[in-house]
């Protein structure tokens, strides 16, 4: 909306937050659901917010570093990259918005938290993929036993699920997992298979 109106969009960039905030940030929440509410639920207390120095846009009060700025209304015009990605590959060149920084605030002796790809990103993100699969199975009334969003699939693209199977439900289980997030491949096994044991899963596929 700001771009269409040719207006700047005030933002805050919060670095060094509680891990619950980092995990919630990787979750694709539906419209109307605030990721900070999810973070507060995981942390057991509300995420403390405060107003920035240059605008009314809130920032996380306990962040190590807060950058306040504004997205300029010039579209995706700044080349950025290449960077290491969660897939353990180098990403391509991307065009991103231009952010003008207006203020930098820090805690006393702040710690700068920089990601080291991929594990710091994909392992916390696996919890969100698993939660999405579990919710899809619950809505589909499928008797789910366990879920493994596999590290080999970058904790994002592959799922192994075990179910207490009733006739015809294996196909429904596959469809439920596929529509839950960005999962590409799904393996469904019986409840006696350990989804975290690659040999068990391969044996189930072979037999």
PLM region spans:
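Internal mixed beta-strand/loop scaffold within catalytic domains of large alpha/beta enzymes
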Residues: 1-14
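Charged, compositionally biased interaction regions
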Residues: 17-207
């Amino acid at each position: 909306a700001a771009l269409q109106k040719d207006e700047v969009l005030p933002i805050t960039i919060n670095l060094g937050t509680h891990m619950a905030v980092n995990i919630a940030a990787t979750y694709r929440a539906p419209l109307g659901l605030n990721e900070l509410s999810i973070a507060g639920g995981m942390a057991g207390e509300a995420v403390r917010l405060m107003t920035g120095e240059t605008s009314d846009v809130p920032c996380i009060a306990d962040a190590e570093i807060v950058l306040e700025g504004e997205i300029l209304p010039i579209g995706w015009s700044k080349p950025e990259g290449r960077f290491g990605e969660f897939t353990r590959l180098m990403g391509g060149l991307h065009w991103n918005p231009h952010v003008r920084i207006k203020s930098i605030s820090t805690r006393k002796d702040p710690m700068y938290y920089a990601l080291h790809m991929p594990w710091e990103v994909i392992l916390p993100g696996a919890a969100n993929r698993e939660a999405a699969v579990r919710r899809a199975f619950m809505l589909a009334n499928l008797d789910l036993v366990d879920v493994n969003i596999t590290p080999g699939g970058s904790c994002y693209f592959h799922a192994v699920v075990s179910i207490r199977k009733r006739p015809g439900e294996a196909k429904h289980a596959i469809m439920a997992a596929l529509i839950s997030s960005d999962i590409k491949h799904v393996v469904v096994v019986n409840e006696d298979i350990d989804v975290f044991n690659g040999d068990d899963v391969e044996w189930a596929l072979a037999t």
